[in-house]
Curated annotation (Swiss-Prot):
Species of the source: Pontoporia blainvillei
GO BP, sorted A to Z: mitochondrial electron transport, ubiquinol to cytochrome c
Entry protein name: Cytochrome b
Organism lineage string: Eukaryota, Metazoa, Chordata, Craniata, Vertebrata
Pfam families: Cytochrom_B_C (PF00032), Cytochrome_B (PF00033)
Compartments, as annotated in UniProt: Mitochondrion inner membrane
Binding note for cofactor: Binds 2 heme b groups non-covalently.
Gene: MT-CYB
One term of GO molecular function: metal ion binding
Annotated positions binding heme b b566: H97, H196
């Protein structure tokens, strides 16, 4: 009798994706983050579902419903903090995953890469609307500041902002619709993940050398299933340590103050994972210019495959590109730090220089370095 996993229409799909999938024999731990992101998504949907059972999306009760979850619901505090810190783990894995893609040239798989950038945008949107839901000070003012950026769009801006708000300010209508968005987006993300995997399995995985591994592939199971389980255990350990020892380490104390439209917090800033983009937004003294820079700082990832000039796919054997890559990482860390600082000197000028360097590296320096390396190959 033929094996059911090779004949059954549904099981066959799973078999070809997770069991008999031919995988390069030399992929490193940097290839673990895809499965970790899948795990993060599952954790977020599960904890989010239980939170939604007790949360009320209404301005008068939202804040107290979150307090009620933490105080009165069985293990509600655990579910709430797993969900909050799960978002941080999600972004850590996302940024590692994107960094791996940039370093090893995974962006050469155009469709997979573009769906991945769409996924990044969807996760960022989900995190933003989710941050508004506890209805603390930073929730309210974050929503006000970020939605207000749309008013920079010529002609239709103000109308657009009022349409998104559902009124003339961030209020009950805004909170209700943001809850609806926050609930639906993870399912859209799940669908996109399936498309992401579909395109990936058309070509097979890349590997650290950037060379085709068709002649040296091994089955995904048991080799990479066990490797993914190890990665998952390490991530869960990190997440539980963070959640159980320092649950508020990455949060903002201002969000423990109920939202008050009459009182603006001293420093309005987003969660840590948006700080680099926030720093780029603030570094341009013009509203529309800042909004465009903010948008382009993420959308620039769509251009990466087109800016590819190197003859070698991976940066493994390209020291000049490696140097620029790590400068880019240092620059992003600098931007993250600047985003958390007040708008005053010397932070303003450092932020402007770091923002300029970010675009310069991706658009000019890295493609130029690749061309120089191509020349060196001919020596």
């Amino acid at each position: 009798m033929t094996n059911i996993r090779k004949t059954h229409p549904l099981v066959k799909i799973l078999n070809n994706a997770f069991i008999d999938l031919p995988t390069p024999s030399n992929i490193s731990s940097w290839w673990n983050f895809g499965s970790l992101l899948g795990l993060c998504l599952i954790i977020q949907i599960m904890t989010g579902l239980f939170l939604a059972m007790h949360y009320t999306p209404d301005t008068s009760t939202a804040f107290s419903s979150v307090a009620h979850i933490c105080r009165d619901v069985n293990y509600g505090w655990l579910i709430r903090y797993l969900h909050a810190n799960g978002a941080s783990m999600f972004f850590i894995c996302l940024y590692m995953h994107i960094g791996r893609g940039l370093y090893y040239g995974s962006y050469a798989f155009r469709e997979t890469w573009n769906i991945g950038v769409l996924l990044l945008l969807a996760v960022m949107a989900t995190a933003f609307v989710g941050y508004v839901l506890p209805w603390g000070q930073m929730s309210f003012w974050g929503a006000t500041v970020i939605t207000n950026l749309l008013s920079a769009i010529p002609y239709i801006g103000t109308t657009l902002v009022e349409w998104i708000w559902g009124g003339f300010s961030v209020d009950k209508a805004t909170l209700t619709r943001f809850f609806a968005f926050h609930f639906i987006l993870p399912f859209i993300i799940t669908a996109l993940v399936m498309v992401h995997l579909l395109f990936l399995h058309e070509t097979g995985s890349n590997n650290p050398t950037g060379i085709s591994s068709n002649m040296d592939a091994i089955p995904f199971h048991p080799y990479y299933t066990i490797k993914d389980i190890l990665g998952a255990l390490l991530m869960i350990l990190t997440m539980l340590t963070l959640t159980l020892f320092t649950p508020d380490l990455l949060g903002d104390p201002d969000n423990y103050i109920p939202a008050n439209p009459m009182n603006t917090p001293e420093h309005i800033k987003p969660e840590w994972y948006f700080l680099f983009a926030y720093a780029i937004l603030r570094s341009i003294p013009n509203k529309l210019g800042g909004v465009l820079a903010l948008l382009f700082s993420i959308l620039i990832l769509f251009l990466v495959p087109m800016l590819q000039t190197a003859k070698q796919r991976s940066m493994m054997f390209r020291p000049l590109s490696q140097l620029l890559f790590w400068i880019l990482i240092a620059d992003l860390l600098t931007l993250t730090w600047i985003g958390s600082q007040p708008v005053e000197q010397p932070y303003i000028i450092v932020g402007q220089l770091a923002s300029a360097l970010y675009f310069l590296l991706i658009l000019v320096l890295m493609p130029t370095a690749s061309l120089i390396e191509n020349k060196l190959l001919n020596w």
